[in-house]
Amino acid sequence: LYNGELEDSNVDTSDGAHAVRANFHATINIGDGLTAGTLGESSHAVYAAQGRSTTNPTGGSKINIGKGAVLSTAGDGSHTVMMASNNGKIVIEEGAEMTTLGDGSHGVAAYADTSAKGSVANGAVEIGAGSTIATAGGGSHGVFANMTGSVLSLDDNVGITTEGDASHGLLAQRGVIEAGDGLNISVEGSGSHGAYVNAATGSIEFLGGATIDNNDNDGYAIYADKGTITGTAGNSTFNITGNMYADNSGSIDLDMDNNSVFTGSTALANSGTINLNLKNNSYWHVTSSSEVSSLHVSGGSMVNLSHEAGMNTVVTVDDLSGSGGVFKFNTELDSEANGDKLVINSSETGSTHYVHVNDLSLINGEVSGEKKLHLITDNSSNASFVGEYMDTGGLWDVLPTVERGDTLGESANEWYLTKIEKKENGNTETINDGFAS
């Protein structure tokens, strides 16, 4: 179909033909329940083609598709939704299912194109709420913005899965990807990133919360290379599994609110920045040594350095703000040497945070004698740290004593673990009562 209107339609093509294509400044309107699939290479299910012409240099192709569309492609280089029209627009309403099988076949893509009629820019794609995007081939991204001025918008509760190597959930090279609340991204292949910008001209904006799952060691959950990735709408819940990386002046800025969970590490290179804001019982489970530009921790939120791989994890924070946060460390007080570390270059004046410990020394009994284990360096000396009772899930609660270095003959910029008190909890009392009876 090249121009016109359809209702409740089935379209199948092969051998390089597109199922639905609007060329130049044509408009296509299709009702609910469309099923469109292609089998050949470079065959798109929905395609807004070159929109610049000598008679209408600014008009773009327009395609509007109703609810519940099922779009699929099987060949290489075949996208379910392809925008290549100057000032064009594609709207896919809610509940669409988009699937690609071939290599280099994206779910939703906006590409720049240059021809004798001029260059293409400013295309827009809107994907409705509750839609799903799945790609299986290598180099096949869920959503790919590669057109100057393009805006690819995802409504709430869109799901994206990619299986192939180097297949990113979101990739912004030129243009903007906007994602509504409840976005769910899962990437499985080697070298695949959940949300990725790889040029200064690209950006990704989370307009609400998101779930991003990437456990691959050579891929990142969130990766900003030159561009920007932001999620600062507030009151949003993020669940992120995988690492974050900012390189070449790229920036990641996330407000993680309302029981958000981040399981992974962070890394910076070449003036990259990562700013994390943990509020209202949010949780960062640090899986290896990490560095962030700024970290806000408040409202009972926790930064847990005590991962299963062992101790001596170091988290470096250029600017720490907030108050009432919790930092949990793996420690071995008896050794006075082994333990995780928090290094802060600047902290908020008058702030207070709490310290929990998972101490190896307690496995074999009590820690006796005068001990001190360096945990925290605050180069600004603005923040205070207080040990807090922690329910370890066993027979005892644990209270660590944390003291500033100048009370121990050390630097006032440093904080030390000096004592661990074991206190009977309800479980201990129940067992003792049982023996007494």
Give the label of every model feature segment:
Residues L1-G16, T27-S42, S61-G77, K89-G104, ...:
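Beta-strand-rich solenoid/repeat architectures in extracellular/passenger domains
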Residues T201, G208, D213-D218, Y223-S347, ...:
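Extracellular beta-solenoid/beta-roll
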Residues V108-A110, S282, T349, S437:
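Short low-polarity hydrophobic stretches
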